[in-house]
Amino acid sequence: MMFLFENSINMIKYSIYLVPLIIMILLSISIKEDSNRMMLLFKSLKLTIILILVLLTIEEAIYVKLNGHLIKTELITFVEYILLVVSYLIISMFEEGVKEGRKTKITEEALILMYSSLIGMLISMEAHNLITLFLSLEITSICFYILALNKNSRKVSIEGGLKYYIIGGIASTIILLGIVSIYKNTGSLMYTDILVIGMERIGNYQVQMGIALIVLGLIIKLGVAPFHGWLIDTYEGTGMLMTFYLTITQKIVTIIVLINLYKNLITYLNIEVINKGLLVLILVTLIVGTVGSLRQQKVIRFIAYSAIVNSALLILFFVGNNTEELIIYSIYYLINYIIGLAVLINIIIGVVKTKNGGNIEILSELKNIWLNNKVIGISLIIVLIYLAGLPPFTNFISKIILILPLIVEGKIYITMIIFFLTVGIMIYYMNVVKIIIIDKKQEVGVETYKMTKGGSITNIVGGIIWIIISQIYLDEIISIIKIIVAIN
């Protein structure tokens, strides 16, 4: 009886992946009126995400499916919740923008592609077979390439999308080359088989090289320096909300895939070259992200460079010895980053806008927010200080607990360099705060702002509440995360 119940749950789960996709395609070609079609697509996509969340709650937290091709743990389940909630939030923001007539750059095809990419991401996080991982990553990547363009005819968008496609293709080729190298030497693509054979042939450099190539390909997809050039141009051409979607979802999935590889293969095979190589990339990324952000005037490029810096901090668990604890802190840091960035983008595109209906694009335009609404101005300052990681906010503490284990392990010089570089990004965040508070004189040619109403206010209030609560219950939140992902 229990076996039949589990099979029924599996059938429902995988049909929920595919049936809504078919329904959305049929809706997009059968309904003639544009507004009705878009609203139905939004509702069906949000309902599908809710159903998947319900199924995640019903099914077992740990399972092995499809002959070991998919394995789910408490950590993966927890991160899947985060991914689905973030996706629901972004889709709701797109829906609100369409209702209010804002320029959100969303089409019916884009909604279908967003859902298709979500399917690929959910599978890739559970993948325990290299070819399953590769195919699911490619589903996501193909959707992202098209979303980066999203029917935008601007030169910068086309150029960014083309760069994304080329670099993504190179990264996929590197990953596939690593998979081929591993299969040639082990005769298997399953993580467990690779681990057993790899430990028997501990001196076989080809298996280690194959895993290193897979990690390198994933790092390129993440946008870590010096493989970051495509990311800046791509994000600038996609629009603020789509940038938010691409930035957050890509980080969530890539980090979890790297954690899976680390916990299942890299740790046991003792591949030191990966740890040392990633340490160099982390330092280079922090330097590039910090220096690059200091000379940016556009909001979206500033967010892109900030994303590069945060990518480096999120993969610090690779260079530490206490991996389990560092993974917990990385997840906690990721949650703080998502909430802070969500509130920032909600303020910029959802609460205030120019007279002609456009979004704030230049950082210097932020000075007028203080003149028009001091409550929103204060909220924006709080979020910027929170993202900068200044004390006493929890984002400062989450950075500290990520970096401090390196001191315990004796990596003092590396820790000092990381601290110095993170201070650099704090300086630029504080420069933006200065623009809001001090440079508040209205200038000719700068539009005033009109307040809008809707879900954006709710999102901002919710984010500010999290910032306050996380200050008070920091230890409790980290303990809850440890319990959820079954790490003590």
Curated annotation (Swiss-Prot):
Q: What is its main location?
A: mitochondrion
Q: Which keywords are on file for this protein?
A: Electron transport, Membrane, Mitochondrion, Mitochondrion inner membrane, NAD, Respiratory chain, Translocase, Transmembrane, Transmembrane helix, Transport, Ubiquinone
- What membrane topology is annotated for this entry? Multi-pass membrane protein
Keyword Translocase attributed: yes
Q: Catalyses which reaction?
A: a ubiquinone + NADH + 5 H(+)(in) = a ubiquinol + NAD(+) + 4 H(+)(out)
Which organism is this protein's natural source?
Dictyostelium discoideum
EC? 7.1.1.2
Tell me the InterPro entries matching this sequence: ND/Mrp_TM
Q: Which GO terms describe its molecular function?
A: NADH dehydrogenase (ubiquinone) activity
What Pfam families does the entry give? Proton_antipo_M
Q: Where is it localised? A: Mitochondrion inner membrane
User: Know the name of this protein?
Assistant: NADH-ubiquinone oxidoreductase chain 2
Q: What functional role does this protein have?
A: Core subunit of the mitochondrial membrane respiratory chain NADH dehydrogenase (Complex I) that is believed to belong to the minimal assembly required for catalysis. Complex I functions in the transfer of electrons from NADH to the respiratory chain. The immediate electron acceptor for the enzyme is believed to be ubiquinone.
Q: Which is one Gene Ontology cellular component term of this protein?
A: mitochondrial inner membrane
| PANTHER family noted in UniProt | NADH DEHYDROGENASE
What protein family is recorded?
Belongs to the complex I subunit 2 family.
- Is this entry keyworded Transmembrane helix? yes
The portions of this protein that span the membrane are 11-31, 38-58, 74-94, 106-126, 129-149, 162-182, 211-231, 239-259, 271-291, 299-319, 331-351, 376-396, 412-434, 460-480
